[in-house]
Amino acid sequence: MGFVLTTSGQMQIVVRDDAAAMTKLLKLPVSKRLGSLAAMRGVSEFDEPAMKQLRQIHERGDGFRVGVDDPRYPAALKRLIEADAWGQLKRDLARAWEYQQSVLPGIHHAETVDVVLTLGNPDDPVFIERTLGYYGMGSIPGSIWMVAWPTDYNVTRIGACGVHELAHNIRTPNVEGHFDLEEWVIHEGLAEVFTVEVCGPDSTGAWYAPVTGKLLESTWKKVTEAFGTGRSFPDWTPYVLGDEVAGRMGLRPVGVPHMGGYAVGREIIERYLAATGLKAAQAIVRPTDEILAGAGLKPRTKS
């Protein structure tokens, strides 16, 4: 989607409260649900690339299945509504942007950020058990997309997940150079620590909580030794998201635990912040090489 960048400090965060529309959608015949979903998302059914992406999410990805009449769906949607998931997003994203502006005004940002939360697929064990039933994508300025299947853990952290994605939205237009594995790992580390600064220490981190001690040491070595390698996301994904996600995408495993790159990224950022005295909201615009050096890592020559 298109977006307009500014340094005004005025960001309009538009959280699409689709709860009522999704409730109606789930009462429709299965044959009409994809069209209804497209209308909710502002997608023309004649826009083949957009419809293909929508089908990918809701037929093979982590979105709820548009071709299935599943009695669990209305109950799950009701639980998101009762948890005020969309309200969480509105409040926490507004608070996060206010915090960012108080710490470092004058940075580049999208004038408007469009935020979408959709219901997830309960039958994917990696999504439910390992990714804890929720995640988002927010690296394209002006857009945050999130998916959730409500659980006891995630229903109070939907807003925090949005804050993580807002950090990506903020960093992308403020750093120059090409995207690579190092930048992806730093993106995730910054987003995690930024979320902690805004929402507190218990708001995030469970995805990679087991990656500590000796496992973190071995993962650190595996991931940082891959810096400077690869040319695209299929090359880097196993080092960031881990072998389980890589395997389901048909990619080569590299010996990294689930979300191991997040744990490494957070460790890099925490080392950098300790060395500089900065906060993540200040470091969010700092160059990759500076952050790596501050964390005691040498930038690697690209191969």
Question: At which residue positions do the language-model features occur?
Answer:
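Active-site recognition of the HExxH zinc-binding catalytic motif
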Residues: 160-173, 188, 192
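N-terminal low-structure segments adjacent to metalloprotease catalytic domains
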Residues: 1-87
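Short helix/strand-bridging catalytic loops that position acidic/His residues to coordinate divalent metals
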Residues: 151, 174-184
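Post-HExxH zinc-binding segment in Zn-dependent metallohydrolases
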Residues: 2-18, 181-226, 300
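Pan-zinc metallopeptidase signature
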Residues: 38-47, 225-303
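Auxiliary, metal-adjacent structural segments of Zn-dependent hydrolase domains
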Residues: 77-141, 155
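Short pre-active-site segment immediately N-terminal to the catalytic Zn-binding motif
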Residues: 146-161
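Hydrophobic/aromatic-lined pockets within catalytic cores
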Residues: 101, 167, 171-175, 195-203, ...
